[in-house]
């Protein structure tokens, strides 16, 4: 039996766990949202101030085509281990990915029904959007700006950056801009050959480091909370204060509704 679907976790296909595994279906649910509202000063009704997307779930259903009870249990355990990765891809979204946790791992509830459908439920909390599998990279040499089209259908997406000091003098301050957001660093020290790197982990925790030292506290009060680029349009990425010998690379993956 061939499957129409395929799911990948950390680029490993589910069907590769065992030849007996058949991917039966993949379902995406409506995202969990919460609306922040304010009461109108007179009369009934509320004004929607903000709609916050909180989570996005994908359910992968599969069958284990073997009547051997022990083998079924062993294969299911291997699928559980497969599901512990952090990046989910599906074959009908070949150019996108989702950062997830396995919220509900599969389990064999019947030893007799060898055609029973099992399911693994994945949930994206930190970034509840599908995002580009291949990032867009924009390079700015020295101080200046560069425009680039950022893919996606969501409002905005996170931007990461790396400032490489290719000169012979220390870079003591730098400002990075993406759209209408900016990170301004002061009283830092990027040595010759060193780099300032800003980025986000799987839990969307921001970091900014020079070598192994955090410089997150060196952002000025004018800095934005996050570096963000609008999706579905051309965006200006800019650098100032880095000097003529700096090379800055901005990295962004467009988000999709």
Where are these regions (language model features)?
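Residue-level detection of beta-strand-connecting loop/turn positions
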Residues: 11, 92-94, 180, 212
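Polar/acidic, low-complexity leader/linker segments enriched in S/T/G and N/D
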Residues: 1-37
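A short, compositionally biased
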Residues: 1-5, 81-86, 168-171, 202
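Short, acidic/charged, Gly/Pro-enriched secondary-structure junctions
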Residues: 63-105, 236
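Oligomerization/assembly interface segments of phage tail-like spikes and tubes
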Residues: 38-70, 114-128, 233-235
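Intrinsically disordered, low-complexity segments enriched in serine, threonine, and glycine
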Residues: 130-257
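A structural signal for short, hydrophobic beta-strand segments that form beta-sheets
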Residues: 15-26, 101-106, 219-221
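Short beta-strand and beta-hairpin "edge-sheet" elements
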Residues: 28, 85-129
């Amino acid at each position: 039996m061939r499957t129409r679907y395929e799911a990948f976790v950390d680029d490993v296909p589910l069907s590769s766990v065992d030849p007996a595994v058949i991917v039966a279906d993949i379902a995406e649910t409506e995202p969990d949202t919460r609306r922040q509202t304010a009461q109108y000063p007179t009369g009934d009704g509320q004004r929607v101030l903000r709609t916050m997307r909180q989570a996005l779930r994908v359910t992968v259903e599969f069958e284990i085509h073997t009547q051997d009870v022990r083998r079924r249990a062993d294969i299911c355990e291997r699928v559980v281990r497969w599901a512990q990765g952090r990046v989910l891809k599906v074959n009908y979204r070949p150019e996108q990915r989702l950062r997830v946790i396995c919220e509900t791992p599969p389990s064999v509830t019947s030893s007799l029904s060898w055609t029973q459908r099992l399911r693994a439920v994945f949930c994206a909390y930190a970034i509840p959007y599908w995002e580009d599998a291949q990032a867009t990279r924009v390079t700015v040499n020295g101080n200046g700006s560069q425009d680039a089209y950022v893919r996606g259908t969501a409002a905005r997406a996170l931007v990461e950056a790396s400032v490489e000091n290719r000169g012979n003098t220390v870079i003591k301050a730098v400002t990075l801009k993406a759209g209408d957001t900016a990170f301004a660093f002061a009283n830092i020290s990027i040595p010759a050959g060193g780099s300032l790197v800003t980025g986000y982990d799987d839990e969307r925790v921001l970091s900014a480091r020079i070598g192994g030292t955090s410089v997150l506290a060196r952002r000025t009060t004018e800095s934005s909370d996050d570096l963000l680029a609008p999706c579905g349009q051309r965006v200006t990425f800019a650098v100032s204060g880095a000097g003529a010998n700096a090379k800055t690379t901005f990295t962004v993956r467009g988000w999709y509704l």
